Amino acid sequence: IDVSLVGSEMCIRDRVGTSGISEEHLSELTKLFTNSNCIVVPNFSISAILLMHLSEIATPYFSTIEIIEFHHNNKIDAPSGTALATAEKISQNMTENLHDPTTDLALEGARGAKAQGNIPIHSVRMEGMLAHQEVIFGSTGQTLTIRQDSSDRSSFMPGVLMAIKGVPNLTGVDVGLETLMDV
């Protein structure tokens, strides 16, 4: 926020790349950027944004949904901000919360953490991975898996460039790369 304070006073266009930004910080940024522009981007991966969008579209057609996110072993938060954002977007297209039929857990947490809409999120932290997420949808006799993989940090650069080029066309504070995409 301190860097953005200087930027807003100088009418500098700002790009903030962070996951898990609080509503309080967003509110502060909104107050700061009244005469200039700022975009807060929790995830610069275009494929992750498209995964969330496609998941929203698929949601009404399936009765069960689970999210599995995989990240490198140095990521300290779980679940990822992208997994939580995906669950939030999915839950907005649900007519009712999901029901988990599991009644006997041999190991606590085996069904994942429950996010909005009672959507299970499973987090994997492992060497050899960077950032991956899949959303699995199921209904009678069929499943659909939507998966996104970032195997190299260079995969975030097209999103960074999109934010740099797009922020002059925004007003105030916008959140998410999707505000610059036609989704």
Question: Could you say what each language-model-derived stretch is?
Answer:
Residues 19-21, 43-45, 70-73:
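Short, ordered loop/turn segments at secondary-structure junctions
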Residues 50-62, 78:
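Rossmann-like NAD(P)H-binding beta-loop-alpha module
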Residues 63-68, 72-183:
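C-terminal substrate-binding/catalytic lobe of Rossmann-fold NAD(P)-dependent oxidoreductases
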Residues 17-38, 53-57:
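Rossmann-fold NAD(P)-binding glycine/threonine-rich loop
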Residues 1-7, 11-12:
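Single conserved hydrophobic/aromatic residue that forms the stacking wall/gate
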Residues 24-25, 48-50, 75-79:
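Short acidic/glycine-rich loop or secondary-structure boundary segments that cap or lie
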Residues 31-40, 139-146:
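Glycine/charged-rich beta-loop-alpha catalytic/anionic-binding loops adjacent to active sites
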Residues 13, 36-39, 66:
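Proline-centered loop/turn at the N-terminus of a beta-strand
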